[in-house]
A protein has these predicted regions:
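Short polar catalytic/cofactor-binding loops
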Residues: 27-33
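Short structural boundary motif marking the start of a folded domain
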Residues: 19-25
Length: 277
Protein backbone atom coordinates (compact mmCIF):
# COMPACT_ATOMS: atom_id res chain seq x y z
CA UNK A 1 0.00 0.00 0.00
CA UNK A 2 2.83 2.37 0.95
CA UNK A 3 4.55 1.64 -2.35
CA UNK A 4 1.42 2.53 -4.34
CA UNK A 5 1.17 5.88 -2.53
CA UNK A 6 4.81 6.62 -3.30
CA UNK A 7 4.25 5.77 -6.96
CA UNK A 8 1.28 8.14 -7.05
CA UNK A 9 3.42 10.92 -5.53
CA UNK A 10 6.08 10.48 -8.24
CA UNK A 11 3.60 10.30 -11.10
CA UNK A 12 2.80 14.05 -11.43
CA UNK A 13 6.50 14.96 -11.71
CA UNK A 14 7.09 12.36 -14.39
CA UNK A 15 3.96 13.44 -16.23
CA UNK A 16 4.98 17.12 -16.19
CA UNK A 17 8.43 16.22 -17.56
CA UNK A 18 6.84 14.19 -20.37
CA UNK A 19 4.72 17.20 -21.32
CA UNK A 20 7.70 19.54 -21.61
CA UNK A 21 7.95 20.64 -25.25
CA UNK A 22 11.08 19.84 -27.23
CA UNK A 23 13.79 22.48 -27.28
CA UNK A 24 13.85 24.42 -30.55
CA UNK A 25 17.09 26.07 -31.70
CA UNK A 26 17.41 28.48 -34.60
CA UNK A 27 21.07 28.54 -35.66
CA UNK A 28 22.93 30.92 -37.97
CA UNK A 29 25.20 28.83 -40.20
CA UNK A 30 27.94 29.40 -42.78
CA UNK A 31 30.15 26.73 -44.32
CA UNK A 32 33.36 28.78 -44.50
CA UNK A 33 34.52 32.38 -44.06
CA UNK A 34 35.03 32.77 -47.82
CA UNK A 35 31.57 31.39 -48.67
CA UNK A 36 29.08 34.08 -47.65
CA UNK A 37 26.59 32.61 -50.10
CA UNK A 38 26.17 29.65 -47.73
CA UNK A 39 24.95 31.87 -44.89
CA UNK A 40 21.59 30.62 -43.74
CA UNK A 41 19.32 29.84 -40.81
CA UNK A 42 18.53 26.27 -39.81
CA UNK A 43 16.11 25.18 -37.11
CA UNK A 44 16.40 22.04 -35.01
CA UNK A 45 14.39 20.40 -32.25
CA UNK A 46 15.97 18.28 -29.53
CA UNK A 47 14.63 16.41 -26.54
CA UNK A 48 14.34 18.43 -23.35
CA UNK A 49 16.45 17.21 -20.45
CA UNK A 50 16.30 18.57 -16.89
CA UNK A 51 18.97 21.22 -16.20
CA UNK A 52 20.30 21.05 -19.76
CA UNK A 53 22.39 23.85 -21.20
CA UNK A 54 22.95 25.05 -24.77
CA UNK A 55 25.99 22.78 -25.16
CA UNK A 56 23.82 19.77 -24.28
CA UNK A 57 21.37 20.77 -27.01
CA UNK A 58 24.18 21.21 -29.56
CA UNK A 59 25.55 17.79 -28.66
CA UNK A 60 22.15 16.26 -29.41
CA UNK A 61 22.12 18.00 -32.79
CA UNK A 62 25.62 16.68 -33.46
CA UNK A 63 24.39 13.12 -32.94
CA UNK A 64 21.28 13.61 -35.07
CA UNK A 65 21.69 16.61 -37.43
CA UNK A 66 18.20 16.73 -38.91
CA UNK A 67 16.27 20.00 -39.21
CA UNK A 68 12.62 20.45 -38.29
CA UNK A 69 11.90 20.16 -42.02
CA UNK A 70 13.28 16.61 -41.95
CA UNK A 71 16.43 17.45 -43.92
CA UNK A 72 19.67 15.78 -42.82
CA UNK A 73 22.50 18.32 -42.77
CA UNK A 74 26.12 18.53 -41.68
CA UNK A 75 26.55 18.70 -37.89
CA UNK A 76 26.72 22.20 -36.45
CA UNK A 77 30.28 23.35 -35.68
CA UNK A 78 31.01 25.17 -32.43
CA UNK A 79 33.91 25.49 -30.00
CA UNK A 80 34.10 24.23 -26.42
CA UNK A 81 36.45 22.53 -24.01
CA UNK A 82 35.95 22.68 -20.24
CA UNK A 83 32.13 22.89 -20.09
CA UNK A 84 32.39 24.73 -16.75
CA UNK A 85 32.98 28.40 -17.65
CA UNK A 86 36.77 28.29 -17.39
CA UNK A 87 38.19 27.96 -20.92
CA UNK A 88 36.12 30.71 -22.59
CA UNK A 89 35.86 28.80 -25.88
CA UNK A 90 32.07 28.50 -26.17
CA UNK A 91 31.25 32.21 -26.42
CA UNK A 92 28.40 32.95 -28.82
CA UNK A 93 25.35 35.15 -29.23
CA UNK A 94 22.39 33.52 -27.50
CA UNK A 95 19.08 35.27 -28.11
CA UNK A 96 21.10 38.32 -29.17
CA UNK A 97 23.24 38.49 -26.02
CA UNK A 98 26.89 37.43 -25.86
CA UNK A 99 27.52 34.77 -23.24
CA UNK A 100 28.97 31.33 -22.55
CA UNK A 101 26.94 28.44 -23.96
CA UNK A 102 28.01 26.10 -21.15
CA UNK A 103 26.35 28.27 -18.49
CA UNK A 104 23.25 29.16 -20.54
CA UNK A 105 20.54 26.95 -19.04
CA UNK A 106 17.60 26.15 -21.30
CA UNK A 107 15.11 26.57 -18.45
CA UNK A 108 16.28 30.17 -18.03
CA UNK A 109 16.77 31.34 -21.62
CA UNK A 110 13.83 29.46 -23.14
CA UNK A 111 10.82 29.91 -20.86
CA UNK A 112 7.71 28.09 -22.04
CA UNK A 113 9.57 26.52 -24.95
CA UNK A 114 10.53 29.78 -26.65
CA UNK A 115 12.99 29.16 -29.54
CA UNK A 116 16.67 29.73 -28.76
CA UNK A 117 18.54 31.77 -31.38
CA UNK A 118 22.28 31.04 -31.72
CA UNK A 119 24.72 33.16 -33.74
CA UNK A 120 28.54 33.38 -33.90
CA UNK A 121 30.37 36.34 -32.41
CA UNK A 122 30.46 39.22 -34.89
CA UNK A 123 33.69 40.94 -33.81
CA UNK A 124 35.94 37.98 -34.65
CA UNK A 125 36.64 36.24 -37.99
CA UNK A 126 34.28 33.35 -38.66
CA UNK A 127 35.66 29.82 -38.97
CA UNK A 128 32.40 27.96 -39.51
CA UNK A 129 28.86 28.08 -38.11
CA UNK A 130 29.23 29.15 -34.45
CA UNK A 131 33.02 28.89 -34.29
CA UNK A 132 35.21 32.00 -34.57
CA UNK A 133 38.94 32.76 -34.54
CA UNK A 134 40.05 34.67 -31.40
CA UNK A 135 43.70 34.91 -32.47
CA UNK A 136 43.59 38.72 -32.42
CA UNK A 137 42.87 38.65 -28.69
CA UNK A 138 45.78 36.31 -28.02
CA UNK A 139 48.14 38.44 -30.12
CA UNK A 140 47.12 41.49 -28.08
CA UNK A 141 48.00 39.62 -24.89
CA UNK A 142 51.44 38.92 -26.34
CA UNK A 143 51.83 42.60 -27.15
CA UNK A 144 51.40 43.64 -23.51
CA UNK A 145 53.50 40.73 -22.18
CA UNK A 146 50.68 39.09 -20.24
CA UNK A 147 52.92 36.73 -18.30
CA UNK A 148 55.47 36.66 -15.47
CA UNK A 149 59.04 36.22 -16.74
CA UNK A 150 60.65 33.61 -14.49
CA UNK A 151 62.63 31.57 -17.01
CA UNK A 152 66.39 31.49 -16.76
CA UNK A 153 69.49 29.33 -16.80
CA UNK A 154 69.47 28.71 -13.06
CA UNK A 155 66.91 28.38 -10.22
CA UNK A 156 65.82 31.79 -8.99
CA UNK A 157 64.33 30.66 -5.69
CA UNK A 158 60.86 31.38 -4.37
CA UNK A 159 59.11 34.49 -5.63
CA UNK A 160 58.13 37.45 -3.45
CA UNK A 161 55.20 37.02 -1.11
CA UNK A 162 51.91 38.82 -1.60
CA UNK A 163 49.73 40.06 1.21
CA UNK A 164 46.24 38.69 1.68
CA UNK A 165 44.85 42.07 0.64
CA UNK A 166 46.82 41.97 -2.63
CA UNK A 167 45.64 38.45 -3.37
CA UNK A 168 42.01 39.39 -2.77
CA UNK A 169 42.34 42.40 -5.08
CA UNK A 170 44.08 40.59 -7.92
CA UNK A 171 42.36 37.20 -7.86
CA UNK A 172 39.23 38.38 -9.74
CA UNK A 173 41.48 39.75 -12.50
CA UNK A 174 43.31 36.43 -12.78
CA UNK A 175 40.03 34.62 -13.54
CA UNK A 176 39.82 36.14 -17.04
CA UNK A 177 39.40 33.30 -19.54
CA UNK A 178 39.87 35.36 -22.73
CA UNK A 179 36.35 34.46 -23.80
CA UNK A 180 35.89 37.64 -25.84
CA UNK A 181 32.49 38.56 -24.39
CA UNK A 182 33.69 42.03 -23.34
CA UNK A 183 35.14 42.62 -26.80
CA UNK A 184 31.95 41.54 -28.55
CA UNK A 185 29.94 44.05 -26.50
CA UNK A 186 32.44 46.90 -26.92
CA UNK A 187 31.48 49.49 -29.59
CA UNK A 188 35.16 50.45 -29.97
CA UNK A 189 36.35 46.92 -30.78
CA UNK A 190 36.13 45.29 -34.18
CA UNK A 191 37.58 45.11 -37.69
CA UNK A 192 37.24 48.90 -37.96
CA UNK A 193 39.59 49.53 -35.01
CA UNK A 194 42.92 48.46 -33.52
CA UNK A 195 41.60 48.76 -29.96
CA UNK A 196 42.82 45.87 -27.80
CA UNK A 197 39.80 45.88 -25.49
CA UNK A 198 39.02 45.67 -21.79
CA UNK A 199 40.30 42.12 -21.24
CA UNK A 200 43.81 43.06 -22.34
CA UNK A 201 43.84 46.30 -20.34
CA UNK A 202 42.78 44.38 -17.25
CA UNK A 203 45.69 41.99 -17.71
CA UNK A 204 48.07 44.95 -17.77
CA UNK A 205 46.74 45.89 -14.34
CA UNK A 206 47.04 42.30 -13.09
CA UNK A 207 50.66 41.70 -14.13
CA UNK A 208 51.88 45.20 -13.24
CA UNK A 209 50.52 44.72 -9.72
CA UNK A 210 52.39 41.45 -9.26
CA UNK A 211 55.75 41.94 -7.44
CA UNK A 212 57.67 40.05 -10.14
CA UNK A 213 55.53 41.19 -13.06
CA UNK A 214 56.18 44.80 -12.06
CA UNK A 215 59.73 44.41 -13.42
CA UNK A 216 58.21 44.73 -16.91
CA UNK A 217 55.72 47.44 -15.92
CA UNK A 218 57.33 50.07 -18.16
CA UNK A 219 57.11 47.84 -21.23
CA UNK A 220 53.45 47.06 -20.59
CA UNK A 221 52.52 50.68 -20.07
CA UNK A 222 54.36 51.73 -23.23
CA UNK A 223 52.55 49.01 -25.18
CA UNK A 224 49.12 49.99 -23.89
CA UNK A 225 49.86 53.68 -24.60
CA UNK A 226 50.45 52.88 -28.26
CA UNK A 227 47.97 52.63 -31.15
CA UNK A 228 44.84 50.71 -30.19
CA UNK A 229 45.63 51.10 -26.51
CA UNK A 230 43.98 52.70 -23.50
CA UNK A 231 43.29 56.00 -25.27
CA UNK A 232 40.87 54.29 -27.66
CA UNK A 233 38.51 53.22 -24.87
CA UNK A 234 35.15 54.97 -25.31
CA UNK A 235 34.03 54.42 -21.67
CA UNK A 236 30.81 52.68 -22.79
CA UNK A 237 31.15 50.20 -19.90
CA UNK A 238 29.36 47.45 -21.84
CA UNK A 239 32.31 45.19 -21.00
CA UNK A 240 31.58 44.94 -17.30
CA UNK A 241 27.89 44.30 -17.96
CA UNK A 242 28.49 41.17 -20.05
CA UNK A 243 31.56 39.67 -18.35
CA UNK A 244 30.44 36.16 -17.32
CA UNK A 245 32.79 36.19 -14.31
CA UNK A 246 31.99 39.68 -13.06
CA UNK A 247 35.58 40.91 -13.41
CA UNK A 248 35.86 44.63 -12.47
CA UNK A 249 36.94 45.70 -15.94
CA UNK A 250 35.98 49.35 -15.55
CA UNK A 251 38.12 49.58 -12.41
CA UNK A 252 41.03 48.09 -14.36
CA UNK A 253 40.59 50.60 -17.18
CA UNK A 254 40.54 53.45 -14.66
CA UNK A 255 43.65 52.15 -12.88
CA UNK A 256 45.66 51.65 -16.08
CA UNK A 257 44.53 55.01 -17.44
CA UNK A 258 45.91 56.69 -14.31
CA UNK A 259 49.21 54.83 -14.59
CA UNK A 260 49.65 55.70 -18.26
CA UNK A 261 48.82 59.36 -17.59
CA UNK A 262 51.45 59.56 -14.87
CA UNK A 263 54.00 57.86 -17.10
CA UNK A 264 53.25 60.23 -19.98
CA UNK A 265 53.67 63.29 -17.78
CA UNK A 266 56.91 62.01 -16.24
CA UNK A 267 58.33 61.05 -19.63
CA UNK A 268 57.56 64.54 -20.91
CA UNK A 269 59.08 66.26 -17.87
CA UNK A 270 62.14 64.02 -17.60
CA UNK A 271 62.70 63.34 -21.27
CA UNK A 272 62.36 59.56 -20.99
CA UNK A 273 62.63 57.55 -24.17
CA UNK A 274 59.90 55.06 -25.06
CA UNK A 275 62.00 52.18 -23.73
CA UNK A 276 63.38 53.85 -20.65
CA UNK A 277 62.26 55.05 -17.23
Amino acid sequence: MAKKKADRRRAPAAESQDKHPPVRLKIRRQDAPDKPETRRWETFEVEYLPRMNVISALQQIQKHPVTVAGVEVAPVVWDCSCLEEVCGACSMLINGRVRQACSALVDVISPKGKPIVLEPLRKFPLVRDLMVDRSRLFESLKRIRAWIEIDGTHPQGPGPRQSQEQQEELYPLSRCMSCGCCLEACPQYGPHSDFVGAAVISQVRLFNAHPTGALQKSERLEAIMGPGGIADCGKAQNCVEVCPLGIPLVDSIQTVAGETSRRFILSWLLGWSSDGG
